[in-house]
């Protein structure tokens, strides 16, 4: 016996679980399917919410009503952003993609995992509502550029 508790001549070989922990990005053993699977069919579905990350999901809201201008002596009200401009509506000068004329607000839901429910053996999640600014511009021919800022 050695001091580690393993007899002479016997060595510890790494088990499958140890190897998988060291190389989590190993290649799939099966080739990809040639036919569409359910996940690829739903990938660009127009009725499903857009999912930019694993924790953020869009919640489409109706456009906000126009903001009234403040009267003399009143504090200015924060302007609600709601814009979808076309490049032909803008002057011919250079325009920054983060120009306020191109901005609108979107509601997002941040989903974070909570603890696991012991009784039902299922994972619980917490959803918190947030806002993000989206700068959007479109041009003739159907092109569009969106920049999302959290």
From Swiss-Prot:
One of its GO terms (biological process) is viral transcription. A motif (Nuclear localization signal) lies at residues 1-58. The keyword Magnesium does not apply. It comes from the Viruses. Keywords: Early protein, Host nucleus, Transcription, Transcription regulation, Viral transcription. One of its GO terms (cellular component) is host cell nucleus. It is found in: Host nucleus. Residues 1-31 are annotated as: Disordered. Modulates viral and host transcriptional activity to promote viral genome replication. Stimulates viral E2a promoter activity by binding and inducing dimerization of host E2F. During viral infection E1A protein binds to cellular retinablastoma (RB) family members and dissociates these repressors from a complex with E2F proteins. Free E2F is then bound to E4orf6/7 which leads to transactivation of viral E2 promoter, and cellular promoters such as E2F-1 promoter. Activation of cellular E2F targets promote cell cycle S phase and thereby possibly favorises viral DNA replication process. Belongs to the adenoviridae E4-orf6/7 family. This is Early 4 ORF6/7 control protein.
